[in-house]
Amino acid sequence: MEHSTPLNEEIVHKKNDENWVIAQKKVFTNWCNIFLNQRSQKIEDLETDLYDGILLGSLLEILSGKNVILSKCKQLKTRLHYINNLNFSLKFIGDEGLRLVGVASEDITDGNLKLILGLVWTLILRYQIQSMQNSKSSQQNLHSSTKPSELMLNWVKSQISDYGHHIKDLTTSFQNGLLFCALVHKLVPEKLDYKSLSESDSLGNLTLAFEVANKELGIPSILDPHDIITTPDELSILTYISLFPKVYQQTLEPLNNNNNISPSLSSSSSSLLNTPNKRNSIQLSKSTSFEQQNQQQQQQNLLSPNSYRNSISFSKSPSFEGSQSTGSSRSISPISSPIKNSTTGNSNLSKSTSFEKIEASNTTNNNTIIIAEESRVIEKIVEKIIEVEKIVEVEKIVEVEKIVEVEKIVEVEKIVKVDDIEKLTNLQDQLTEQQQQYQEKSLKLVNLELELQEKSNQLVDKSNQLSTMQATNSELMEKIGGLMNDLTDIPTQDIKEKDEIIANLKIESEKNLKCFQDDFNALQSRYSLTIEQTSQLQDRIKQLINELQERDDKFIEFTNSSNQSLADNQRVIDQLTNEKQSITLQLQDQQDIKEKEFQFEKQQLLSQIDSITTNIQEYQDKFNNLQQEFNTQQTLNQQETHRLTQQLYQINTDYNEKQTQLQSEIKDNQTINEQLNKQLSEKDKEIEKLSNQQEQQQDEKINNLLLEIKEKDCLIERINQQLLENIDLNSKYQQLLLEFENFKLNSSKEKENQLNELQSKQDERFNQLNDEKLEKEKQLQSIEDEFNQYKQQQLSSNSNIDQQLQSTIIELSELKEQKELNDSKLIEKEKQLQQLQQEFDQLNEKNQKDHQDQLELLEKQLKQLQQEYDQLNETNQSIENQLNQQNLINKENLNEKEQELLKLQNQLNQQIEKIQFDQQEFSKQNSINIELVNEKNEKLIQLQQDYDQLKQQNRSNDEKDENDLIEKENQLKSIQNELNQLIEKNESDHKEQQLKQQSIENDLIEKENQIQQLQSQLNEQRQQQSNQLSEKDQQLNQLIEKNQFDQKEQQLKQQSIENDLFEKENQIQQLQSQLNEQRQQQSNQLSEKDQQLNQLIEKNESDQKEQQLKQQSIENDLIEKENQIQQLQLQLNEQRQLQSEVSIDNDKILELEKQLKQCQSDLLKLNDEKQQQDKQLQDKQIEFDQLQLTFNQFKNDKDSQFIQLQDDQKQQLQSIQQDLNQLKQENQEKEKQLSEKDEKLQSIQFENQEKEKQLSEKDEKLQSIQQNLNQLNDENQEKVKQFSEKDEKLQSIQQDLNQLKQENQEKEKQLSEKDEKLQSIQQDLNQLNDDQIKKNEKLKEKEEQLLKLQQDFNDQQSQQLKQLEEKLSEKENQLQQLKQENEINQLNQQQQSNEIIQQLKDQLLKQQQQEQQENNNEKEIERLIQEIEQLKQQQEIDQSELSNKEIKIQTTQQEFDQLSHNRSKDQLHLQQLQQELDQLKQSFDDQDHQFKKVIDERYNLQLQLEQSTLSNNQLDQLLKEKLKPLELDSNEKQKTIDDLLSNISNLQISLQNDKDLISERNNSIKTLESRITQQLSLLDEKDNLIKDLQQQKQQQQQPPTASSSPSSSPSLLSSTPTPKPQRPNQIEIDRLVNEIVNRNQDLIRKNKTKFYKLENGDYIVNSIIYRLSLDDDNDSDLIAQEYENGNSTTFEKSLRIFPSKNTRPIFDWRALFFIGAAVLAISTLFSSSRPIKYEKPT
């Protein structure tokens, strides 16, 4: 189980990555703070504190000592200013010579930690470690290692060599802390006891070393000991160690001054700069590129620690590269002349190359003439050289493979062991030694070659075989030039390794050269006699060499000029790329801001979801608690029922005893009760009326509120539907974007001029987008105004509610006053009761009868109480059921909300997946583009190979004459020019591809920005929904408060009713007092019976005691009931709390409704944006039409240029014919002169030379003509490509049509889904109706219960009155006590009853509200059904319109298909014509070749004749040498001369025939040109037809746009501003302009200028307006003021010329695109000497 799983390995790897990042962060922050403390600044967190660029700028100023950056920075709190500040500092770093790859200002503001660490590391390398390289103490051990890690290791080793430590690397070796202690101990031995340290206590060692270094040496403790023990990082340790050398230098300066250190680093760099050759400049550029690559590796390897350290440990310093590059740069030193090279010797030659061999062979061949027999030997030698070179190439490949294998092994060993680094340094030393040996051997080779040259100078060839030997020399030159090309093709980075291979090859070539030397020695012995004969021909050869050098100089000048033009083009391209980079930076900023907003909103949503889940759990807990409490209450209720049954049993016993006493009182009370019942019935009717009125008012209010709530619910449903539609629209929008990208890619294939125009149009589009943003902001402001109006309406409604509340408060105050009055009345009545007590003693006898009646009433009351108790239990159960139902409903609602949130999250995830998929596709496209580029590069390589093959073929064919060599050199130059053109084209194609890739990347960035915008809009919609729901909740709370106020009003009214009832009771008491008075009269009559009454009183006292006991028991029972009522009140309070929580949920629902409203507004915005996008598409179509117009203009210009070229070619051919005729005449004259005298031959030679020069010039003209023809062919191919692009655009239009069909199908599906939703809504309505019926039944039951409770309450009050009458029979003291207790009990009971009634009324109100909500829902559903029917009707109308449009589109497609078919035919016809042209060109080239051969033969004959004229003896010798094998006589010599003359005449005849052939060819070319012009005219007609069709489509699909492109026709003058009255001097201006136009009509016709006059007197010349005047005119001043104030709507895209001296000319850069061919005409119109005042634009 020792093996670790891959999962664990991954976890460990991640932890290690995190650890080294944290360690480097600590060290680099501490390093920065060392320097920032000078300005009392500090970095606390490196990841975030550099965001504004101020700290970074101050750090760079401190390090460099240049106070340049902070003066430019601005301390503003915006992202753009932060990025601008950071750009200043990054630019400063680039100016200092450092290159940062992948680090941008946005990365620093966003806190990309790894890139920030890379930036700081580059600063450490530059300003700390590289500065140490220049110090004396650090240069002692720099010969073998120049990398930073090796440099520091060697320095540490040199300083701590006495301590006996074995140092391997910069990580594990420093873990125990002993090395740090040794470094400190060397400087401060008295402060640190080194011998007492142990390796095991690593933490103690490290802390001690850091503390002593900080206190004693002033080296700040950057490192953390714990980080070094756990994760030792190489870079952090390297930065800390780099602080020591300065301290060592200060303390140990006297010792170090004695050591003389060799400046090995600087010498190599100086040798680089002193070499003047081109090869040296190449080496320098490549060495700098190598340094840049090392810096790139160091910055990129921050992502992983291992690769990061390897890149540092094996990176090379620039000085070491310089020393190696000099070795390769010495090989190419300039050679002034062949004679100087022979004298200068070894001093000027540092390294032998193949190029020097060429020139050496030229010098030998120029100074010697070799005999024909020895040429064969030389050919064999050349063949051997070629074989050796092949063998060398094979060995090169084998050795390169070996070297690659060795490099791989070395890389493996680097990872395994660090000790192998020293081996690599040794290998580098060996390489340098081998290079020195190679240089020595190359010098030896040069010496040997010089000896061969001296020996070959002695070789002499005869005059007849001079041409053959020169041909062989040319072959050698070309072959060795091919070798040079092969050598130059080898990459400069591999030169160091391949120089060793070349050295070995040179050793082998020396052996071969020794063999050749023996052959040359043999040749010297044979041809020593022929040296004297070559002296005369040397002068001729020197002249030819000088001519070649002049031609080379011309070619070099041409290459320099072409290089300058290429450099200018590259500068323009760099400017464009910089502009694009700035735009991309802005887009990236916007993208980052939107991403952060999206993440913030996402976190808010997640927090809301968490809060909702916590609320749900709280509700569930509360519900469980309520259930438990309810169970406890049930048990208590059962106990109370048991007690009540016992009390009933006791009361029944008392009842039987007192029946007899109450019978007498019943009769008297019956009459009184009848009267009271009548009064009560009347007042009950009045109360019912009042209550009905109040209920109606409340019902109306509740119904209105419910209607509003239902309307909002309908809006929410609509918004949800619109959200779904928006999602579909977004998907369609993405498809449109993809199509638009394809369109962009197709359009980017056009020429660079069109790209520039498109860039200008993109700027205009950017302005349009800004305008659109302003429009959107205006729309938002309008929406906010509407929202404010809605708020004001709500405030007005709230004010009305407040007024109602105030009115209710006033009523309450009035009721309170009435209560106070009633209390005063009660006091008076108590006094009356005291009077009645005295009379009550007399009526005891009658009261006994009344007691019986009271007992009966008590029994009834008990029964009623039981009934009420049962009813209360039922109501409690019903309330609990309702609460359970409400809780269930709330749970369901919450679950639904959670589901909606999950759906939204799924949608977001889907969008993110789509984005990832788009990115993958983009990466695939990039890979495809890269493959295409590689294929093109391969094709280039093949072209180069073909070029080499052509060279070899040309070499084999050109073995005869020097003239052939010269001609073929010209051909090679032309081929090189073509190759350069091809390379330039390839480079331009590559740049175009890069531009395309950048455009694709920009498009992807725009897509991502749009997606993020959509996501932000969705989040805003959600927030708006939440706000809407919160508003709804607030409205519901307001309604609840209103209901509470209404309930309070009802309570007050009930209290007033109760007071009325109390007054009635008082009236009843008054009646009783009247009765008592009657009884007093009776008592006077019964005074005689007092004795009997006394006896009865004694009995009554005993009875009263018994009653008191019973009353006490009853009072105890009442107290228990009161406790129970209090418990019920607590339960009710808890229920109210639950209701409050439900109200909070309702508030949240209102907030969601607000969010839905905001979603609606956003949807409207999206629709507006979609309309704007449609407008943009329309604008693009208009731009497409403009491009077509420009294309037609371009085509016309090209046709005119083609015609001019044809005319020029005809003129050149005529001139050539004339020159040929002249040559014929001259040749005839020369033949006559030869026949007459030999002396005239010399003069003829000079004339022939001049004519040969003329012929060469004419040949060059012919080559230029051929190049022009090739260009014309290329232009035709480009036109074909443009036609293909148009076809692709038409295909894209067809795709758009198909997409419209798919959209219609999707809309039909959506309608079907809506129908299904309607059916489901109808089902829900039926269910709601059933629920309403049930609820109405429940309400009726509850109303009945309320009526019963009221009746029971009245009964209880009557019973209490009877009990009071019974108690009056007792004594005064007892009666007073009983009265007080009874009053207290009455008040408690009244309060309890009022609370119960209020609760029941609240329930009723809630049920009524629910009913009203359901009614409102029904109404809204009916509205929705009506709207859906309207939508269906609209859809039918849209479908009919779409069908009509499809029919029109089909017709246009048919027409377009026909046109495309015709176009394809035309293209085939064009291809056939091109093939014919190619055939003619080939035949023409063949004839030219034949013609050249004839001229060459003629030239050779003339040379022979010239040589014969030198002297008769020489001529005889030449003839003898030629005719040795035949041994001709003197007579035969004359015959040979005659034959030569006849050949010359034949040549002249052939020249005439060639001229005839050329004329025929010209005629055939003219016929072909006429055909091409006809076909081009047909193509123009077809293009016009296509444009007409496209304009018809635009008129069908789009409304006519207001903007019109500038044109030359006078119909466009209607779009110009309103005409002004003509000026006073207009007549003179018109006269002068007409004179100028009449003078320059020819030039205007050539340039095809279009000239019109406006009604206000201005002139339009090729869409450019010119205003002319003879006097100072105020109009120009007004126009200038308007333009400066921004009122330039009528003057855009125009170039105006004003006459007055005070005003400035207005110049718009866009007008330059429309000037075109009118420049010459304008210059002629306004350059005359007439007194027209004008100012030309700058």
From Swiss-Prot:
Residues 1-1705 are cytoplasmic. The gene is abpD. One of its GO terms (cellular component) is nuclear outer membrane-endoplasmic reticulum membrane network. Pfam families: CH. One of its GO terms (molecular function) is actin binding. It is a single-pass type IV membrane protein. This is Interaptin. The lineage of its organism: Eukaryota, Amoebozoa, Evosea, Eumycetozoa, Dictyostelia. One of its GO terms (biological process) is sorocarp development. Belongs to the alpha-actinin family. The keyword Nucleus applies. Induction: Up-regulated by cAMP. Residues 285-350, 1068-1090, 1589-1627 are annotated as: Disordered.
